[in-house]
């Protein structure tokens, strides 16, 4: 749902087949059988395997991959390991090194409403200029999350996904890398994005003014200003 505005944008879909899928445990996708017996933790290997299995099963041709937040981090891993497969990667709010800044235990407790606390934790990541309608639409996605899922996702986002020791090996001549981060993002900050770009030779960086952590959903009209030129450059390459 976070990508619904891109899915119906004719400027984009006239040149690209846009596919957005729900990871297991997320959105309309169910968790696997027996999920109740284990704590959910998204690891780098599981994430990569899930995305690449989806891509290969759909027989994608010359694909461009774009992800936001934890998805942005994942695209950078794929730029390193699947450079020959992807035409380009677009990391929205994605960096190769991040640091936790709040206690994750609050995200899955019996005495706290999980959906509301998850939305509260990310609410400050949305730019103050973003339209109220889309602000609350974005927060609703977090309010609807399953028990412990956001906490499990952050295991990858804040811990297992760090790879600043290997990101300098990304070859942007084979797989161009675009880093786009909002100026109001206090998680994947502009500074962390720039640091990442400095480790990845040839990475193209845009700090999006007036944008927070969820560009494609919190302010889809403003996002066009930043994503259209990137897609045009990919088409022209």
Q: What is each PLM-predicted segment?
A:
Residues 67, 71, 75:
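Gly/Ala-rich beta-loop-alpha elbow adjacent to hydrolase catalytic centers
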Residues 203-237:
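Catalytic active-site module of serine/aspartate enzymes centered on a nucleophile-bearing elbow/loop
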Residues 100-101, 114-172:
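Conserved alpha/beta-hydrolase catalytic His-Asp/Glu region
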Residues 173, 179-181:
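Short beta-strand/loop motif that positions the catalytic acidic residue
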Residues 76-117:
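Flexible "cap/lid" loop of the alpha/beta hydrolase fold
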Residues 183-188:
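Acidic catalytic loop of the alpha/beta-hydrolase fold
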Residues 17-66, 225:
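Active-site loop/oxyanion-hole signature of alpha/beta-hydrolase fold enzymes
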Residues 1-7:
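The serine-hydrolase catalytic nucleophile loop
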